[in-house]
Amino acid sequence: MKALKRILSTVFLTITIFAAASAQTLLGKKFTATAEAEALLDLTASSPGTSWLTAGAEAATATIFVDGRKHQDVILFSGAKPFTYKLLLGHVAAGEHSLRIDFNREQSAAKATTINIADAKVTLLDRTQPEFQAVAHTPFLFARANTIGKFSDVPLLMYYETVKEGALTTYRYTVIISNEDGGTQTAALMARWGRTTDIEWVVDVQVDAQGKVVNSTYQGVQHETKTFQGKREADHPLFLIKSDNNNFADDGESPMRFTLRPVGVDLSKHSREWVMDQHPWTHTIMAEEMTREGKITAERTLGARIADLRTYLYVDVASNQENGALLSFALKLKNDPKWYTSDLGIGYYKIERSGYFRTTIRLPQGVTPDKIERLSARCDLTGNPRSKEEISKASAARCELNAINSVFLLDERFQPGRTLPIRTGNVTLPFGESVEIRV
């Protein structure tokens, strides 16, 4: 019996020590809501000795508790630099509430030893404030299981668009994720999307004038649009990031959860990538993850590896492609006879979709804006039309180039530099034609 007691005592001591070692409380505070509200948190924090660029020292992780219950995890991707993480604490009733923030050693990088909290500001958003409904229906995301502990494919930013139809309002939520381990190859991402982050539509939530949910549809695995039938936490729908290309499931959980505070945007005249430009740190995290994962090379290759992201020219465009037309761009440098293309001569790398979008052109290392001479846009045709029907359709193929909204290189911090003075009015390009634009 004494031996058993000694064993149990040893086990209890081991568990206690492990619990103390795996979590450390960094901050505890109270806050009071005078009415039901959505609680917001501005967490300004840093983790000395960590960097998203460095394997083994990628980031520290903080775990946040509300009223004693685990609410979310925060991966401090900004590393040793103080950064304000804008988060949601969810729905709170009127009354006093508690906030606790722990250093989660288990989910932190091996070389992460502590977290410094400079500020943890709680604000409350009640029903009288215009953005309440958009915030109250923001989805909460459980991490994709195979990313936990890998510091890869991390949700960075959530945004929403608002569409009003009579008495109904639809909030469309989209998440920007640091990378995409599955899906489109990296070289194709840069040509077709102008980025290596993953920007994924999550869910549309339609509400009536009282804020009651009328309908919710989301992006399921294989990009299937599905009706949401899962759980909600108050009005927040819960999703698991399910597939390697970051599509979602409305059932299932994982040990890590992210509850990002969304920013409202109007994309009626902008690309989705423009949201990244408004939050330029997302470009930095994108570049650091690519470098750490060995996806950057000086070699001219296709597939998973690309050049330093600062060697690309980023071109933001408004254009409509009709009847199988494809759009691509090329650039000429001063004192250089070559033209550098966005599609790398590959049909799949050309852009067939219409609207506002982004592409990139890979340039030689060390190119600066003053070395750029001319930009051209080219309209091509899908496939090899042979039948009478195919030829008839192809004959009407054209690209309606409406605007070039911005053209830039990334600076030394991997953030967008000044926009180059390249503008064009509406230009109609039948297939097989191109237009040249001087800088």
Predicted region positions:
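Boundary at the C-terminal end of the N-terminal hydrophobic targeting segment
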Residues: A19-A23
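Bacterial N-terminal signal peptides
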Residues: S9-F18
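Extended extracellular/luminal ectodomain segments enriched in beta-structured repeat modules
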Residues: A33-D42, A94, L168, I306-L313
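Beta-strand-rich ligand-recognition modules
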Residues: Q24-L26, T44-L124, P337-K371, T382-S387
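N-terminal "first-domain core" detector
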Residues: A118-G182
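Short edge beta-strand/loop segments characteristic of extracellular beta-sandwich folds
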Residues: K30, L40-S46, Y314-N320
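Domain-length functional cores that host ligand/cofactor binding and catalytic or interaction surfaces
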Residues: V135, V163-T170, I176-A187, A191-W201, ...
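Generic short beta-strand segments
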Residues: L43-P48, D102-E106, R172-A187
